[in-house]
Each structure stands twice: as C-alpha cells, then as structure tokens.
Amino acid sequence: MSNQQKLTNPFYALLSLPSTAMGFALCVQINALSWILSEKYKLSIEHVGYVWLAGPLAGLLAQPIVGLISDKVWFWGGRRRPFILIGGVTASLMLLALPFLAEVSLFTGLGILATAIVVALTLDLAINVGFNPTRSIIADLTPEGEARTKGFAWMQTVSGFFGVLASVIGAVAGNYALIYIGVALVLVLNVVPAFLLKEPRELGATASHDSPTELRAGQGTTKLSRLLHIYLAHAFTWLGVQTMFVFLFAYARDAFFGGRMDLGDDEGKTLGKIISISFGIMQTVGFVLPVLVLNPLAKKIGLVRTHTVCIFIMAIGYGALAYFGTGLPILGLYALMAVVGIGWASVVSLPFAIMSDS
C-alpha cells in the first residue's frame, strides 16, 4: 500500500507542496515587485500602483473560472494536474522575467511600464490559475473528516513556514537571490508533486467541495446573503492589506532615505532588506499566532469576535504608521509590523472558518 493510500505524513507533506509553491510565488511578489520596479527600473509610485492593479483584475476572472472548470475536465492524466503545471511553470517564468524586464521590453518593443504590467498580469494569472487546484487536490485525495482537516492543516503549516522563509531569504541574501530561489522552488514544488500524486478519475461525493453553485436553500448550506456580508467585510480588510503590499517600500523610502528616487546600489539593497524584514516579522506572527492564540481565543469568544479584535489591532498598527510617518525609527517600523501581523494572522485563517460555520 502506497503512502497516498495510507495517508502517511510524507504523503501529507507532498500534498501540501503545490499550494506552498503558489504561496511562495506570491511572497516573492510581495517582497520584491515594488522594490525592483522602483529601484531597478525607476518607475514612479503611481506607475508601480498601475502594475499591481493588474493582479486583482486577473484574480477576479481566473480563480472562479478555473475553480469551476477544473471539477469537470480530465487531461494530462489528471483533473488538477494540468492547472497546477500550467500555473507553476508560468509563474516561475514570470518571476525569472522580473530582473530582465529591460531586455524583454527591448525584445518586444513595448515600453518598460507596459512590459511590467504584462509580466505582473501573467504572474498573477498563473498564481490564480494554480491556487484553487492546489487546494482542491487536498480534498480530492483525502476522505472527509479528520483526514481532510489534517491535510489542510499540513498545507497551512508548510505554506506558512515557506512564507517566513521567503522574507528571511530576502533579508539575508537580498531580493535578487529571493527571486532566483523562488523560480526554482515554484517550479520544482509544483511539477514534482503533480506527477507523483495520483488523482481519482471520478470525484466522490465528499470531494465535491466549496463550489459556489451548490448554495441551495433548505439543505443546511450557507445563506448567500450571509456569504455576501462576509465577502464585503473581507474586501474592506484587503484594501488596507493590498495597500501595504504595494506601497510599504515607498513609506520606508520616505521614512529612512528622505524620499529620494536616486538611491545608490547599497542604499537600494538596504531598502530591500528593510522591506523583507518588515514582511518577515508580519509573516512570522501570522504563522505562529493562529494555532497558539487565535484558535483557543475563538473557542472562548467566538470566531467573529476574535477576527474583529484582530482587525481592530491591525487598524491601530496602520494608524500608528500613518501618525508617526517619517519620524518613525526602523525598529519602530518592525514593531508596528508585528502589530499588523496580528491582523494578518486572522486574515489568513479565520475568514475561512467563519464561512464554514455560517
């Protein structure tokens, strides 16, 4: 009997790797995209915002479409495998393109801004194409109940560890090293498991999961109005989170380098390390807090109240960043990113539990 049939820990570890790879690609994007566009290609803060805008637009289309299609197709020996392979290979290629946007621009004849938008859009499309199938395959290959819960717990743990690792690499070795390591990890952690995991030809009843088409009245499922309330609240949270992802580098440049656009190589690398350490602190809090604090607290006061408290604390952190502005020391930034990490820990864990219980 194989590890997959026995549901051994090595199988769970292997099963978590494709989702981890996509999460790592996203972490590389968060740590390095704004920095490299500003420092290497000298794009203005407004143009950096335009490049980042491509991502959410891609996600709005790609995730729902792929989520619906991947339940109903079978090619390349799997239902999820094709999307995991396409997403993983494309994401790794787009990460590799980031340090070579000038060369890509020269080859295609597009301006540097247009090239950056195309690469960022394709990167986000690739991540979104892969994300749902990498999570769906966990449900496909595990029986409902404790085994499936364990599968998602493994995914969250391994993904969280690699998210912290991405920031550590950026802080210690620099963002260029992070990008190149990301290219290799995203490719290997997607491609190898995709060929080692054997998918069932037919989906059982327990594997038909989380499809929005299955919201039927009178069958004990979540009410659509309730879901919309949760989605709306979560959307406002992401206004703050996405703003941080895009513009923290500009905040740090204003606070610690006088807002100068003409930073030298050493100053630019220092700015990149400040950003990586900041996100590393946030990711570390987000990694350890759900199991150690949030889950026990939610059992006492409820999921919604716990999430509300965490988001309120995150808002205080953002408010302090805005209030202190350019007068904030570097250690102050790191401390406030730990405060923001409390909200981040809730954002990446509790909304899904709230939806399940609604």
Predicted regions and their residues:
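Helix-to-loop junctions at the C-terminal end of transmembrane segments
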Residues: 61-78, 288-303
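C-terminal transmembrane helical hairpin of 12-TM major facilitator-type secondary transporters
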Residues: 305-350
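Helical-face signature of the major facilitator-like transporter fold
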Residues: 15-19, 23, 56, 119-124, ...
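Loop-to-transmembrane helix entry
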Residues: 43-54, 147-154, 256-287, 331-335
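C-terminal ends and interior cores of transmembrane alpha-helices
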Residues: 83-110, 312-327
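Intracellular loop-helix junctions on the cytosolic face of multi-pass helical membrane proteins
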Residues: 1-10, 102, 106-121, 125-247, ...
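Transmembrane alpha-helices of Major Facilitator/SLC transporters
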Residues: 61-62, 272-297, 317
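Helix-loop boundary and gating motifs at the non-cytosolic
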Residues: 2-58, 228-265, 352
